[in-house]
């Protein structure tokens, strides 16, 4: 069984995730900002060529970036908030490569989200803010999606998950 913990800021999501991780130690826990098979919040999603440029630009912390990076086809996911550095502007620079906050067209955003859920195979996992919070917020704020459009998005996603 998988657990998806959702809620507004301050509602106790992290506390509940911590309790579930203690109660079910065999579960893999994905907190917001971790590398997750389904969620990309607080992660930069870049092409291989842009990734190489980032490694060159931040050569002094290259090892830290590589330790917090994951290959996904022609892209790399950098969990940049996990990189502890005092380099001015590093986190702000990588933030621009998140898929949220209207940085991508809605079609590209949808393609990435659906692809991640279609390719996810797993059980015994606990996810924080991975199914609704970031996706719904982004859909409400940037393409200004209506309630019916958001529900349609999730209906289509559910159908695609059933096909897996």
Ranges and model annotations:
Residues 12:
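Conserved glycine(s) of the Walker
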Residues 16:
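Hydrophobic positions on the alpha1 helix immediately C-terminal to the Walker A/P-loop
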Residues 100, 104-164:
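ATP-dependent NMP and nucleoside kinases share a basic, alpha-helical "lid"
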Residues 8:
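P-loop (Walker A) phosphate-binding loop of NTP-binding proteins
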Residues 81-103:
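Conserved P-loop NTPase mechanochemical-coupling segment
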Residues 5:
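Hydrophobic anchor at the beta1->P-loop junction of P-loop NTPases
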Residues 1-2:
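Extreme N-terminal, non-catalytic leader segments
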Residues 21-76, 137-139:
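Conserved substrate/cofactor phosphate-moiety recognition/catalytic segment
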């Amino acid at each position: 069984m998988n657990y998806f913990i959702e809620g507004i800021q301050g509602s106790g999501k992290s506390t509940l995730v911590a309790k579930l991780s203690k109660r079910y130690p065999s579960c893999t826990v994905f907190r917001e900002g971790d590398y997750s098979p389904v969620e990309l919040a607080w992660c930069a999603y870049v092409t291989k060529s842009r990734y190489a440029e980032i490694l060159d630009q931040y050569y002094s912390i290259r090892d830290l970036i590589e330790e917090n990076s994951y290959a996904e086809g022609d892209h790399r996911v950098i969990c940049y908030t996990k990189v502890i550095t005092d380099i001015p502007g590093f986190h702000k620079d990588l933030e621009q490569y998140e898929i949220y906050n209207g940085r991508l067209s809605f079609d590209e955003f949808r393609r990435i989200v659906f692809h991640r859920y279609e390719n996810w195979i797993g059980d015994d996992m606990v996810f924080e803010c991975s199914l609704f919070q970031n996706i719904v917020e982004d859909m409400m704020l940037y393409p200004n999606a209506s309630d019916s459009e958001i529900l349609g998005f999730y209906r289509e996603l559910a159908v695609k998950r059933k096909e897996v």
